[in-house]
Regions:
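Conserved ABC ATPase "signature" region
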Residues: 78-86, 177, 181, 188-206
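Conserved ABC ATPase signature
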Residues: 169, 210-214
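Catalytic Walker B motif of ABC-type/P-loop ATPase nucleotide-binding domains
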Residues: 235-239
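ABC transporter nucleotide-binding domain
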Residues: 253-344
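Conserved catalytic motifs of ABC-family nucleotide-binding domains
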Residues: 231
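Conserved ABC transporter NBD signature motif
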Residues: 136-146, 151-156
Length: 391
């Protein structure tokens, strides 16, 4: 009977050996084969297929009960309050992240959603090793981010939409050269990578322009190049399209989609622009007030509201529907400035409600739409708030 091979993982590499014959050992990437979790593969499966099978099942990012509590000084107002604070200070604790757990496989492009202050950026910083968690643990490609090992630093990149890593008074190309030296990237590899990224983002004519003289969209493209020069396997993006015009947003989204498809980079994206999420992510993780409230397919989240449609009706002048009609058709809203009348109704009644609208009075225009993702997310936050209220 053929014995199966047993594979171990450390730093996202696979090491295989025959269980019944210790003289047979294959070290695919070169490291200690005794470290890491065990993974079993069929005995005659070629090693390169074993490697692919292994990576398709082992998470790239594992987060278990990750919590971060910030302790802040509570200042008492007034002069004597300041004096008292010199001797006896009062502090309050605020949990930015509470027992967050999730796993992300290699190559996944996951949206990380939540309102301002929900804990998204805090979580990304913990995964990057910039801040320590109060409790819980995380593993990224087998590494513990809190140890800040150099090998791990070469594995990931963090892009913060509102913070720059490029030197303001230098051309972008000089910042790239400095990053090449920091990461120890060979010159030939650096040139190949840079040429590819510059071509994909169409910024070849801007490399020698001072960063301070670039537009916001051009600066963000340069930030992405800087983050990807060392070919990271994991990319954390914190609102990369914030403040960009529509054309720049589209260019950045197109680049990220193509880069993820081509190199299977694992990407965790936060954004308040739902167009980013809809175009790039098949899965979303939603957090609110530090708690995870949804983790699953974006389609499933939308399907939760898919049983409803939104009817937009434009009424001429001061025309209005009878009060008895508006009160009997669920959620209705009238905008007196635009004359727009909005009705949300179940999909199965959409035809009947539309016909009733048209027969009720003069209508300038009528449109039937799906409920926007922004509204679905907002309703998710609202329902979570309602559940958390004491009875």
């Amino acid at each position: 009977m053929e014995s199966e091979r047993r594979c171990h993982v450390r730093a996202a590499h696979v090491y295989c050996r025959n269980i019944k014959d210790d003289n047979y050992a294959v070290d695919v990437k070169g490291a200690n084969i005794e470290k890491g979790p065990v993974f079993f593969v069929p005995p005659k499966l070629p090693l390169h297929l074993s490697y692919k099978l292994f990576h398709s099942r082992i998470p790239m990012i594992e987060v278990q009960n990750l919590t971060r509590v910030f302790r802040t000084y509570k200042k008492i107002p007034g002069f004597w309050g300041g004096v008292k604070g010199l001797f006896k200070r009062e502090f309050e604790e605020n949990a930015a992240a509470k027992d967050i757990s999730f796993t992300i496989a290699e190559g996944e492009f996951v949206g990380f959603l939540g309102p301002n202050g929900a804990g998204k950026t805090t979580t990304l910083k913990m995964l990057s090793g910039l801040i320590y968690p109060t409790s819980g643990q995380a593993r990224v490609s087998g590494y513990d981010p809190t140890k800040r090992e150099n090998a791990y630093r070469r594995l990931f990149a963090l892009v913060l939409g509102q913070k720059n890593q490029l030197w303001w008074d230098l051309p972008a190309i000089e910042s790239f050269q400095l990053l090449r030296a920091i990461y120890g990237i060979p010159h030939a590899e650096f040139k190949t990578t840079l040429d590819e990224l510059v071509l994909l983002l169409d910024v070849g004519k801007k490399l020698n322009v001072m960063v301070r003289e670039l537009s916001l969209g051009e600066r963000m493209k340069m930030e992405l190049i800087a983050a990807l020069l060392h070919r990271p396997r994991v990319l954390f993006l914190d609102e990369p399209t914030i403040g960009l015009d529509v054309i720049s947003q589209k260019a950045v989204r197109s680049f990220l989609r193509e880069y993820n498809r081509k190199y299977r980079v694992t990407i965790l994206l936060t954004s308040h622009y739902m167009a980013d999420i809809k175009e790039l992510c098949e899965r979303v993780i939603v957090i609110h007030k530090g708690n995870k409230i949804y983790d699953g397919a974006l389609d499933r989240l939308e399907a939760g509201s898919g049983s409803r449609k939104k009817i937009l009706t434009f009424l001429p002048g001061d025309t209005s529907f009878p009060e008895t009609w508006t009160s009997g058709h669920g959620e209705t809203k009238r905008d007196p400035e635009t004359g727009k009348f909005t009705v949300r109704t179940p999909s199965e009644t959409i035809v009947a409600v539309s016909q009733e609208i048209l027969s009720t009075g003069p209508v300038a225009d009528i449109t039937i739409e799906d409920v926007p993702l922004e509204d679905i997310i907002a309703e998710l936050f609202t329902s979570n708030d309602a559940k958390s209220q004491p009875a």
